[in-house]
């Protein structure tokens, strides 16, 4: 039987105390940290981008599960990979060629 993975979202964090909240979920036993990236186009909300992911990577000791809820995710995969994403997920309806995007993600050494 496979292990259940706990990946709490940072959207419920206090962004004024983001590092503290990240440490709280890590200390509580979270396996991954889920980061929802929203662009205001693919979904109506806007959240965080590459600089915040890079900052989170500096203070987090667990893998970053970056969820791209954006249009044209292929344009941003390299930047999020370089910012420290360990896992990148995207919405199949946001791309024309799902396998090409998976291959692109993996080409940066990131899980898809």
Regions found by a protein language model. Give the residues of each.
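Conserved N-terminal beta1-alpha1 strand-loop-helix module at the mouth
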Residues: 1-89, 93-100, 104-110
